[in-house]
């Protein structure tokens, strides 16, 4: 059969499958820009003409508001929607010629879940026929929509409020950490309580952004993944320091070379 997979919303590429052969498209880009959406439609048409194919079905992300989903639905073909994190696991299975049922761990930014919440830290039991959601990271309230992906301090305030359950404790902690003003914190807590522009999320990426802000590493990101990456680098640096400390005999002050198991001076 012939199938077209519409690709993701960010860093989009699509793919046309003909029986057991697959033809990925050139890089298209982020579909938040309408010019890129237009380029996606044009590139789909050109690749279909080049390959002389007429796809019978189109596959797209489960998110109803993704432009990739909208484009897929406009093709006039039967649409098969696949959950974002299930797709990640399927790609790993296909790459490794895995035909068995697996326990898949999929941690990333955000993806639309089958329950209408935002997923991103998932453990799924999966095969090519479907999946069962076995578990996830603890859900939290993500306030501010897409803005919170760039401003991790918003996630931080939400995490603090969720874990204290008390407005005054939240305001006190936020003030000590210098995350935002008292008024901003009050607004975010109110939004979380009333579910105003707030969604339940299990996104590992957003959790890392929030923790990065709480630890004073990055309050916000100026480019994609900045806060999470900075958190990773800080953790690696701390780990390196801990390993270095353990390699020094605190009594004699002599350093032990682990690889050769010999003592060195200095």
Please give the residue ranges for each predicted region.
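Short acidic/glycine-rich loops and adjacent helix/strand connectors
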Residues: 1-249, 253, 257-266
């Amino acid at each position: 059969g012939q199938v077209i997979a519409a690709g993701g919303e960010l860093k989009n590429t699509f793919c046309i499958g003909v029986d057991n052969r697959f033809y990925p498209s050139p890089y298209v880009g982020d579909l938040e820009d309408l010019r890129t959406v237009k380029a996606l439609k044009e590139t789909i048409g050109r690749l279909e003409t080049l390959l002389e194919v007429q796809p019978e079905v189109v596959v797209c992300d489960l998110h109803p508001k993704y432009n990739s989903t909208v484009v897929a639905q406009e093709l006039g073909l039967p649409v098969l929607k696949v959950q974002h994190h299930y797709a990640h696991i399927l790609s790993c299975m296909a790459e490794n010629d895995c035909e068995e049922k697996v326990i898949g761990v999929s941690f990333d930014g955000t993806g639309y879940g089958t329950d209408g919440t935002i997923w991103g830290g998932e453990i799924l039991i999966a095969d090519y026929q479907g999946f069962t959601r076995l578990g996830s990271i603890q859900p939290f309230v993500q306030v501010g929509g897409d803005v919170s992906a760039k401003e991790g301090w918003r996630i931080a305030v939400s995490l603090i409020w969720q874990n204290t359950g008390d407005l005054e404790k939240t305001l006190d902690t936020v003030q000590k950490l210098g995350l935002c003003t008292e008024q901003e914190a009050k607004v975010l807590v109110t939004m979380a309580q009333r579910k105003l522009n707030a969604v339940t999320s299990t996104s590992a990426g957003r959790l890392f952004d929030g923790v990065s802000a709480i630890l004073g590493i990055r309050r916000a990101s100026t480019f994609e993944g900045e806060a999470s990456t900075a958190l990773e680098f800080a953790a690696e640096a701390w780990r390196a320091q801990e390993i270095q400390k353990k390699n020094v005999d605190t009594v004699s002050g002599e350093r032990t070379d682990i690889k050769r198991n010999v003592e060195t001076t200095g």
